[in-house]
Amino acid sequence: MGKLYDMLQEDYRIKEGLKTCINCGTCTAICPAAEFYRYDPRKIVDIVQKGNEDEIEALLKSDTIWYCGECMSCLTRCPRKNGPGLVIMALRNLSAKLGYFVESEKGRQLYPLTKIMTGNILKYGYCIYPDTFSWEDHVESGPVWKWHTEHLEDSLERNGANFKGKGPGILRDIPQESLDELQKIFDVTGATERMETIDRYSRMKAEQLGMSMEEYYRHTFEYCSEGHFNDDQA
């Protein structure tokens, strides 16, 4: 076995999610992501189980490990109680740690996701925050969300929110003391270090592609090539 395999074995999710896979394919049959994406959790588990270093490295640099929605349907149906979703989490973790995520289109999307969501959490105390939500970036949310963003204050008031207000209520202003505690949690758990790692490798990739960070952000956020979905042309 190689170095990458050994690093994976240190992850508790591998210990809990990969026990005695018999390659029956039940996980792929039940997987919602496999219905749409070119994604086969059975093959992924088989690659990890074999421990081939080159194949594991290819996985870590691929789009494949980013298709999983982590719903864990696989765990509920596996006759041997394996959890391919847990294996995927371990692969994603190692890919981010080593910087391999920037080698795949879906992996590079870690940058805008981290920038937006963790930025919102640490600055406002919320994953999604009205001031940073742009309907133009999420047109799939439909006309209802378009109307909602155009009439934000009225909509929030009608729903009883306390937007940016003091005291209890939806979207209330989070005290700085609480935000400082969130930052400490990020620091202690390694989340801050992970954010810095993602930022560092993303900047290196942007430089390699000849893009500014804003250009890289927009590209990773908006671009989607063909070949990800089952009905795409090969």
Q: Where are these predicted regions, by residue range?
A:
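Short N-terminal secondary-structure initiator segments
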Residues: 1-16, 25, 188-199
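Residue-identity detector for threonine
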Residues: 20, 26-28, 64, 76, ...
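Short, charged low-complexity intrinsically disordered segments located at boundaries
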Residues: 73-80, 117-128, 214-216
